[in-house]
Amino acid sequence: MFASLRTLVSVGLGLKRLLDLGRAPAPDAADAQTLELLRRADEARQAGRRDEAGTLYRQILQSRKNHLGALRGLRDLAAAAGQWSQALEAQQRIIGAVGSSERSPETEWLAVVHYELGRAELAGGHASAALPHLKNAVRADRHFLPAALAVGDAHETLGEHREAVRAWERAAEIHGALPLLARLERAYRQEGRPTRMIALYREALERAPDNLALAVALGRVFFELEMLDEAADQFEKVEVQAPDLPVVHAFLGAVFERRGERREAFEEYRRALRLGHAFDWPHRCDACGAATPVWQDRCPACRRWNTLRPARP
C-alpha cells in the first residue's frame, strides 16, 4: 500500500513539473534580462532617445506581450510625441492587462488619450469625428472635465445647441467647475433665461457652500443682470470671509460706480488694484501646486490634465 502511495506521489510531482514547464511566464516576471531591457529603455526615453527606447520596449513585448512597464513606456513615448492613435493602442492593452486595483489611474489615462484625439479632430474642423472620442473620454472617466466641456463645444460647432446644453447640464450634475458653469450661463443668456442663470450658481453653491469662486460668480451674474443690490450683498458676504480678494473689490467698485457712488467706487478700485489681478480668479494645480491666472485643461508647469482647481485665498 505504501509503495502504491509513493508511486502516486511520484507521478503527481512529475505531472506538476510538466505542467509548470508548459505554462507561460507571468507578464511582469522580474527576470534579469527583462529588467535590464526595461532599465535601458527607460533611460533612453528620459534622455530623449525615442527610437532607441521604442525598440527596447517592443523587444520586451516580443517575449512578454502584456508587460506593463513596456506598454506604459510605449504609451508615454507616443503621448510625448502627440501620436495619440499609437497611445490609444498601448493604453487599451494596458487596460486589458491591469488588475482592478490599478484600473482607476489607467482609465484616467484612457480618458486623456481619447480627449486628445477628439481635441485634434475638433481643432481640424472635424467636429463629427471628434464627438465619438470625446464621449469615450467621458465614459472612461466622468470626472474628466476637459472632455465634458469639449463634448458640448463639438455639438455647438455642429449647430446642435440643445445637445450642447444637455451635455453640459449632465456634466454639471457631477462638476461644479467654473468653466462648465460659464458655458451654461452663456447658453442661458442667449436663450433669455436670467432666472436660470442665477439658479445655476445658487444650486452649485448649495452643493459646495465653501466655494468662494462660485460665490463670486453668483455676484457677478447679479451685477451683469443689473441687480445691483443683490450683487453688493453677495460680494459683501464674500468679503467677510476673504477680505483680501481683489476680484471682490473690483466688482464692488463697479457696483458703486453704477450706483453713482463715485467715492466708494474709487476706494474699492484702489484696493483691487493694490491686491492685483482684479477680475481674475486664480487656479492652482492639485498635482504640483503651480498657480495660473485662469483655468486650463492642462497644468502649464507639470503638464498633467484635469488638475487645476480654483485657488483658495
Where would I find each of the regions flagged by the language model?
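Alpha-helical segment of the N-proximal tetratricopeptide repeat
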Residues: 24-63, 79-80, 113-129
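Short coil turns that delineate tetratricopeptide repeat
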Residues: 65, 99, 142, 175-176, ...
